[in-house]
């Protein structure tokens, strides 16, 4: 059990763990205060939104912030767009977990379970999860896998939360492990992800620490700053394939060499193909003559 992070603390954690985040206006004080407890907190629940979203910020600022006709917002604390951006939607009690299995809650509190959890209670007959869990809504339908960028961000977000509270990966669960009514986060229609695998990945992410490299999107600029004299790494198979090539033993070649070699080999391959085509034409002509002679002789 733990006191929930403050809004300032969660922003600091996101920055510490290298997560690109977007603050929806008003998020820090937007919550369901007066409609139930908030804290002590025990974990983080992964959700899918149930729909593929084209405008992540608009969805976070609209549906997730305001809620639905029968379920007022905020509907989560965090949301993750397809590009891996983390949106801060609300802070405090949020309508995301609903009712769930008290046995699952006990396991999360004690971090004493193994494998996938299978709840026997749901929203109507379970205990209040909104007071105990942070919630992240990952913006995808659940009928297919989330994007790679979303999975990276969700793991790092989880690690950031665990890092602050000193929890293990067993404080991260899927909504479908909390409530018998749910199956998120999904990878196919009606099928929850293998959460033990997710937890293992979260554990590895946390162990790697906040300074571990984070995949970044490719530059959209034509200017990359790379010089022709800069070195580029070659795969280990290259050295294994040509062990006597001294220039490859340091595992790198210059951009100029790489480009020149690529052009040279491509040119040689092109000329080789042209030569083979010419030989095939000659062979076909010779075969036609031979066939004609054999036919006459018969």
Task: Explain the meaning of each model-derived region.
Residues 88-90, 228-229, 233-238, 242:
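A compositional/sequence signature of small-hydrophobic, Ser/Thr/Pro-rich patches
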Residues 1-25, 33-38, 119-232, 249, ...:
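Basic/polar, cationic surfaces and motifs that engage anionic cell-wall
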Residues 89, 219-222, 241, 257:
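Eukaryotic intrinsically disordered, low-complexity regions
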Residues 54, 94-97, 144, 180, ...:
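Residues in flexible loops and secondary-structure boundaries
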Residues 1-129:
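N-terminal catalytic cores of peptidoglycan-degrading enzymes
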